[in-house]
Amino acid sequence: MTLTLRVLAPDQSVFDDTADEIILPSTTGLLGVLPGHISMVTAIDFGVLRVLKNGNWDSIALTGGFAEVESNEVTVLVNKAEMGKNIDSGKAEAELEKAKNQLSQNKDQGNSPEKIKAQETLNKAKAWFQASKSD
């Protein structure tokens, strides 16, 4: 028995295939899903979705969104997603360093919009870098 996984962003379908197991980056921590999982909806955080198929793991970088598990079908709706194998790790690492610098420049800003944006940029850069290194 397998799962059907669909990962959708507003501008593209990133993944639409079967999987043996998936690990979702939910807002409450990592969530493993196997065939026969109970029906549920969960919020998705910035992070890496891991997909096991035929003994091989693939990674998908995600920004926030939602996931629904229903009858061995998992649908993930996010603002942005990209397959780890399509991410240039050098570019992802450069973006991560840039985001760290941007956040450090705003560290004394309290909860200013600039600091919140810098933290969001850092979270996205971390997810893309991790996904680029996972494949």
Curated annotation (Swiss-Prot):
One cellular component term from this protein's GO annotations in UniProt: proton-transporting ATP synthase complex
GO MF term list: ATP binding; proton-transporting ATP synthase activity, rotational mechanism
Subcellular location, record wording: Cellular thylakoid membrane
Its membrane topology: Peripheral membrane protein
Keyword Plastid carried by entry: no
Region feature (Disordered): 89-114
Name used for this protein in its record: ATP synthase epsilon chain
Extent of Basic and acidic residues compositional bias: 89-100
Biased segments, Polar residues type: 101-112
Subunit structure of this chain's protein: F-type ATPases have 2 components, CF(1) - the catalytic core - and CF(0) - the membrane proton channel. CF(1) has five subunits: alpha(3), beta(3), gamma(1), delta(1), epsilon(1). CF(0) has three main subunits: a, b and c.
Predominant cellular place of this UniProt entry's protein: membrane
InterPro entries: ATP_synth_F1_dsu/esu (IPR001469), ATP_synth_F1_dsu/esu_N (IPR020546), ATP_synth_F1_esu_C (IPR020547), ATPsynth_dsu/esu_N (IPR036771)
Lineage: Bacteria, Bacillati, Cyanobacteriota, Cyanophyceae, Synechococcales
Similarity comment text for this entry: Belongs to the ATPase epsilon chain family.
Function description: Produces ATP from ADP in the presence of a proton gradient across the membrane.
